[in-house]
C-alpha cells in the first residue's frame, strides 16, 4: 500500500511581476516538513507552481497524495488544460506558447509516480495549513535570494488564453 501524504501549498508575489516566494507543507502521518524560497523577480502563478513542484519532488516513494492549493490556475492547469497543451506541442488554443511551460513540464514529471487528488481551498479564509503556507510564501518573498531563470525567458514570449 502506498504512503498517504497531504501537501498544502501557496505562492506569493509582491507586485506581479515582482519579488515572490512559495510555501509548502508536506505531511505524512505525524511528520511534517515545510519548504519555502524567495525569488527576486517572478509572478504569483510561477510561485504557486513552484510550491507544488518542490513538495512533490521531495517525495522519495510513489505515494497517494492529496494536494491542497488555493490556485485555480494550478489545479485547472494540471487536471484539465495540460492535456491539450501537450497535444498541441505546448501551445494554447490560440497557438501561442504556454506561459510557464518550464514549470508545467516539471510539475507534469513530478506527478507521474504518484496518485493525486487536487483539492482547491479558498485562500485567506482561515484554512490553517493554507494560512501557514501563505505566511511561509510571504516571508520568503520579503527575503528573495534566488533568480527565477525561467521567468526571464518566459518574459520574452507572449501568452494567450490558458487553454
From Swiss-Prot:
SUPFAM superfamilies: Ribonuclease H-like. GO terms for molecular function: magnesium ion binding; nucleic acid binding; RNA-DNA hybrid ribonuclease activity. Residues 1-142 form the RNase H type-1 domain. It catalyses: Endonucleolytic cleavage to 5'-phosphomonoester. Mg(2+) 1 binds at residues 10, 48, 70. The keyword Lyase does not apply. It comes from the Bacteria. One of its GO terms (cellular component) is cytoplasm. GO terms for biological process: DNA replication, removal of RNA primer. Keywords: Cytoplasm, Endonuclease, Hydrolase, Magnesium, Metal-binding, Nuclease. Its EC number is 3.1.26.4. NCBIfam families: PRK00203.1 (NF001236). Belongs to the RNase H family. Endonuclease that specifically degrades the RNA of RNA-DNA hybrids. This is Ribonuclease H. It comes from Sodalis glossinidius (strain morsitans). The gene is rnhA.
Amino acid at each position: 500500500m502506498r504512503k498517504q501524504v497531504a501537501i498544502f501549498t501557496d505562492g506569493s508575489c509582491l507586485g506581479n511581476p515582482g519579488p515572490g516566494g512559495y510555501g509548502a507543507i508536506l505531511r505524512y502521518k505525524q511528520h511534517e516538513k515545510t519548504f519555502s524560497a524567495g525569488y527576486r523577480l517572478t509572478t504569483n502563478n510561477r510561485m504557486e507552481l513552484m510550491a507544488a513542484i518542490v513538495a512533490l519532488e521531495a517525495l522519495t516513494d510513489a505515494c497517494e497524495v492529496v494536494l491542497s492549493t488555493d490556485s485555480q490556475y494550478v489545479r485547472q492547469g494540471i487536471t484539465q488544460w495540460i492535456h491539450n497543451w501537450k497535444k498541441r506541442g505546448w501551445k494554447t488554443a490560440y497557438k501561442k506558447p504556454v506561459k510557464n511551460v518550464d514549470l508545467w513540464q516539471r510539475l507534469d514529471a513530478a506527478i507521474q509516480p504518484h496518485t493525486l487528488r487536487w483539492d482547491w481551498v479558498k485562500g485567506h479564509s482561515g484554512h490553517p495549513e493554507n494560512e501557514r503556507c501563505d505566511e511561509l510564501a510571504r516571508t520568503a518573498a520579503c527575503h528573495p535570494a534566488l533568480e527565477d531563470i525561467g521567468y526571464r525567458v518566459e518574459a520574452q514570449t507572449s501568452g494567450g488564453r490558458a487553454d
